[in-house]
Amino acid sequence: MRLLSSNSMTRSVLRGMTLGAIALGVSATATAQDPEEWFTLGGDFAHTRYSPADEITAENFADLEVAWEWDGASFKAVSGRSTPSLIDGKLFTVAGNKRHVVAIDPKTGETLWSYREPDTPRGEYSMRADYGKGVGFARIDGRGVVYIASPGFFLTALDADTGVPIEGFGQPVPIDGFPRTGVVDMLADLGHPYDPYEGLPLETGYITSSSPPIVVNDTVVVGNSAEQGYHQSRVENVPGDILGYDARTGAFKWKFNVIPKPGEYGHETWENDAWEWTGDVSSWAPLSADPENNLVYIPTNSATIDYYGGFRPGDNLYGAALIALDTRTGERKWHFQMVKHEIWNFDNPTAPVLLDLDMPGRGKVPAIAQITKQAWVYAFDRITGEPLWPIVDKPVPASIVPGEVLSPTQPHVTKPAPYDMQGITIDDLADFTPEIRQQAIDALANYQMGPLFNPPIHAGNDTGKFAAMNCPGGAGGANITAPAVADPETGKLFVSSHKACFALRLIPGEEADLLYPNTTGVTLSEWANAGPGATSRPPRHPAGIPLWKPPYSRITAIDMNTGDHSWMIPTGETPNRIKNNPALEGVDVGNTGTGALVPMVVTKNMLVYSDAASDGTPMLYAINKETGEIMEQIEAPARSSYGMSSWVHDGHQYIILQTGSTLTAMALPGAQAQSSGGH
């Protein structure tokens, strides 16, 4: 067992943000746009998901039709997590739990080529197999190269025209079926003993990938992920160190230690020698970059085991942080830790968004904005790391769980204002009628309500409560299924969020271990998550409605030049289960929103989002970017998930919906192709 000595309980607190030596400069390339290109899964290096395409307007939006559908069933595609890149007249994406790489004709939807990595146990085991999200891309000597990080944690470089592995890239992999060139075994560069075929021993930990690499100038930067922290009951794992490779040769360039080693900045934030044997801190979310300044931005997740960290006392840097690294060397330029000693599942869920702002009294500012599950936008100068508005440490509740020592303070954003509910009190509960309000109060009687950083509680605690309410919970606020989007011409950020409270309850580690077969590590944690999913049994309203006041989901427009909210709208329509609920008969509930996070894309003329009508009919909405008003709405074949995109091909604008196992291309009638689509 890992035991805490008495002196290991002494806390060492570091400022959230520190600076290294940085050359000053304002990038004009991170947010550069070409309507005929969608370069990264976020559209550009800045992850704005913006297109200057303007063929689709409020006047013709109702004329949109399905131009083609690409069916990924033959690749066993399910989730729709991957946003295709449009580069040099081809779409590139990944599909299925084998993470097939696929090139698609953007006019017809026909498959041009596909590539699949040979099967390995280390790839088969990945709990993030169908999480690929997209590809990386670079032009090497005029040749297009597609890069993919696989579930088995191999980096592969493919010819963009043929799908053939690139000659002279990487080293031969000693596994039958692998190409002799074009592949890098990235496990070798993490520094842990492993078997090339089987991967890391589960007793040591597990590393996989859930987002694509990003190619910044001549460096391929790769993040990674581990198993979901709410499925863990043992304390050992490996850190998800960030890796850099030569884009031309695949040669290893650098590694950034996300859990600092002795002598490195932040090492003292890991007490009990936890840096030696625990892990998980990584970047499962996508990365963004400022190529002109050779900077890549790493949004990190939490350390091992969601909801309990008694075995890893300290602030646990660089968990739940945003890190700026020099792409040439991997050197840290600055960082900010959003949550110290993170135990709420408040990992950073999306790539940060880069904007070039014009701030009153300050002029031009190269900015970066990180949306979070906790309903704050953390905004910084992306070159220096200085917050655009003060972020102040404030006291937060202590834990009553034996062995858990939380940070006494957490950073609080002062501007922009939160874009959704933070914490929960009686005043936040549904009050359509006095009876409904009392029923909501009664439903929460056995739950510990509290502020944003309300800590989990354990079974058998002295309060007699079943669980602690965590609002927002680990599903957001904002989350990966609906990344924020931005208009670089105006500096407006559009954030999709929903009220998604979790109930946090811990049980003894030996009991939790029975819920999670094949978990990593060997030593049982004293406490672990009591639910088979991310939350324990939540409270329910007897009327079958949410316990809290609407809106249940929303889009908030934030002017990042000033930090002020411009407008807020509920998303979709009030579901029939609420609109026609007998308990609400005669009550005008207004538009509550569906409660779902909504994928969005921004164009020259509008904000577009995907949600549903009251009866569940999938809908596509065109929104006025300045006012939030609905300009038009149409039925769609299905709801999009994890993102949307828009670009121009052959003179016509398309909107791509990620509809589960398919991709659906919407366009005006003039763009209709003769083909009905590919695989």
Question: What is each model feature region?
Answer:
Residues A32-E55, T409-P418, I424-Q438, D442, ...:
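N-terminal pre-domain segments of enzymes
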Residues A32-F75, L86, T556:
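Mature N-terminal segment immediately following signal peptide/propeptide cleavage
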Residues G25-S27:
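N-terminal signal peptide c-region/cleavage motif recognized by signal peptidases
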